[in-house]
Amino acid sequence: MKVLLIAGGWSSERDVSLAGARGIEKALCALGHDVTWFDPATSLDGLLEAASSHDFAFINLHGSPGEDGLVQAMLDTAGCPYQGSGPAGSFLALNKAVSKQLLRRHGILTPDWAFLAARPAADWEPGLGYPLFVKPNTGGSSLCLSRVTQPEGLAPALEAVFAHCGEAIVEPAIPGVEVTCGVLGDTALPPILIRPAEGAFFDYTSKYTPGGATELCPAPLPAEVTAHVQDVTLRAHRLLGLRGYSRADYILRDDGALFLLEVNTLPGMTPTSLVPQEAAAIGLDFPALIARLIELGMTAAGR
């Protein structure tokens, strides 16, 4: 097939997108596909025309215009199939303040939060206690994520977010271990337990620096806990109207309470990223995972 590989974009996660796309291109070529790159930052105006002349689009964008559903809407207009969720599910999952309301309404635990659409007054306090996390409301890769332990650290953390993003979300730090779990088709994958370097948390540096974190797959958790993580992951995937694949990130507290932090509709796709690790645990190497995502995308488009 003629595959349009969409990567780059204009978000702060551009470099992550391009790095992952190189591995995807290699896998697509190994599968026998003819690959053409398209970078929305260069010419978003040309996407409809490019998509119309290709059999499939593989999206590897992080942040806007991929995770917010814009590219998916344009591909739908062009009649070009693609992997993953459609415009509505993509937008809903990317917006943490909105998706958290939906998840909580349906009984899924998520940390309390304060949402900010603009810089607050200098003396503003979220009333969530310390430590807490400050992060963009619509963003990934843990960019601009700050852990704040004292009130005097709140204003600089918020400024770091608003320097790059229009909205912020503040959450209390939940003590526990970090767990992530992917969905492929209608199946929850084996969860991963993440152990950041001592004294750190799973921020951008930990994610993309060798040795920044230890990722244990499958997670060394009791069978009933693993089953619970997978069940909640599938529920969240369906509640948000997602399809194809996704990845949910959690904090698992010592008492067994599982707090869903966010759901990613275009999770990292380097061969060593989290979802590819989970797929490998069930016998799917990276090219096989890419092939499965294409198959799911074609099926969703009725092809």
Swiss-Prot record:
Pathway: Cell wall biogenesis; peptidoglycan biosynthesis. It is found in: Cytoplasm. It is an enzyme of class 6 (ligase). Its EC number is 6.3.2.4. Residues 100-295 form the ATP-grasp domain. One of its GO terms (cellular component) is cytoplasm. Disulfide bonds: none annotated. ATP binds at residues 127-180. GO terms for molecular function: ATP binding; D-alanine-D-alanine ligase activity; metal ion binding. Its cofactor is Mg(2+); Mn(2+). It holds the Pfam family Dala_Dala_lig_C. It catalyses: 2 D-alanine + ATP = D-alanyl-D-alanine + ADP + phosphate + H(+). InterPro entries: ATP-grasp (IPR011761), ATP_grasp_subdomain_1 (IPR013815), D-Ala_lig_Van_CS (IPR000291), D_ala_D_ala (IPR005905), Dala_Dala_lig_C (IPR011095), PreATP-grasp_dom_sf (IPR016185). Mg(2+) 2 binds at residues 262, 264. Its main location: cytoplasm. SUPFAM superfamilies: Glutathione synthetase ATP-binding domain-like (SSF56059), PreATP-grasp domain (SSF52440). Keywords: ATP-binding, Cell shape, Cell wall biogenesis/degradation, Cytoplasm, Ligase, Magnesium, Manganese, Metal-binding, Nucleotide-binding, Peptidoglycan synthesis. GO terms for biological process: cell wall organization; peptidoglycan biosynthetic process; regulation of cell shape. Binds 2 magnesium or manganese ions per subunit. NCBIfam families: D_ala_D_alaTIGR (TIGR01205), PRK01372.1 (NF002378). Cell wall formation. Belongs to the D-alanine--D-alanine ligase family. This is D-alanine--D-alanine ligase. It comes from Nitratidesulfovibrio vulgaris (strain ATCC 29579 / DSM 644 / CCUG 34227 / NCIMB 8303 / VKM B-1760 / Hildenborough) (Desulfovibrio vulgaris). The lineage of its organism: Bacteria, Pseudomonadati, Thermodesulfobacteriota, Desulfovibrionia, Desulfovibrionales. The gene is ddl.
